[in-house]
From Swiss-Prot:
SUPFAM superfamilies linked: Prokaryotic type KH domain (KH-domain type II), Ribosomal protein S3 C-terminal domain
GO cellular component, as recorded: chloroplast; cytosolic small ribosomal subunit
Summary of subunit composition and partner proteins: Part of the 30S ribosomal subunit.
Chief place of localization: plastid
GO biological process: translation
Domain of life: Eukaryota
Protein name: Small ribosomal subunit protein uS3c
Keyword Phosphoprotein attributed: no
Keyword tags: Chloroplast, Plastid, Ribonucleoprotein, Ribosomal protein, RNA-binding, rRNA-binding
Length: 214
């Protein structure tokens, strides 16, 4: 039986970089990893409202200085008036990590929302939760193919589509999405839509271009 490889993990070190960049000895590794998970869980709760697409966590050698780089399509919501939103984020994060941690938060605006798989998946989720037909929601997501930075897109929705008793998956692809080509710059995201018929899964693959190293 065929197994599918995660498009981002498959390309780590080639076209993708690690979302957590730090080193730790065996004694402290699990503690720092758990802290990262708590931070991501908290920020992912804000992802839909603030259009957060990616979270990068960097630490120093001791692990007590944390740098959060948050990529978002709506930076104004996170930053707030005069940076009040950043202070609130830091205060809330410090509630579930040790007091000796120093946090620096950088909010990075996504340059092109039409070339970001996470934000496109959020758009599909929003439409599904607003009871838009799933085929129409997928078709609207495919409009991003008109952007010059996107050469191909694939969108898949799975679950009790249109309230059917039996769950199934349907997908549509436009352009090229070469998942087996390591040099292909693939962006991938998975989301969940809570509908009256249950939870629907949404997956989006974006093929931007091929990265040729000299």
């Amino acid at each position: 039986m065929g197994q599918k490889t995660h498009p981002l993990g498959f390309r780590l070190g080639i076209t993708q970089e690690h979302r957590s960049a730090w080193y730790a000895d065996f004694k402290h590794y699990s503690t720092l990893l758990e802290e990262d998970d708590k931070i991501r869980t908290y920020l992912n709760k804000l992802a839909k409202l603030a259009s957060i697409s990616d979270i990068h966590i960097n630490r120093n050698g001791l692990g007590d200085q944390i740098e959060l780089n948050i990529e978002t399509g709506r930076p104004g919501i996170l930053v707030g008036d005069n940076g009040s939103g950043i202070k609130t984020l830091a205060t809330n994060i410090k509630k579930f990590i040790p007091n000796n941690r120093q946090i620096t938060i950088n909010v990075v605006e996504v340059e092109n929302v039409n070339a970001n798989a996470s934000l496109i998946a959020d758009l599909v989720v929003q439409q599904l939760e607003d009871r838009v037909a799933f085929r129409r929601a997928i078709r609207e997501a495919l409009q991003c193919l008109q952007d010059n930075q996107v050469n191909g897109i694939k969108v898949e929705v799975s679950g009790r589509l249109n309230g059917a008793e039996m769950a199934r998956s349907e997908w549509i692809r436009e352009g090229r999405v070469p998942l087996q080509t390591l040099r292909a710059d693939i962006d991938y995201a998975t989301k969940e839509a809570n509908t009256i018929y249950g939870v629907l899964g949404v997956k989006v693959w974006l093929f931007k271009n091929e990265i040729l190293k000299k």
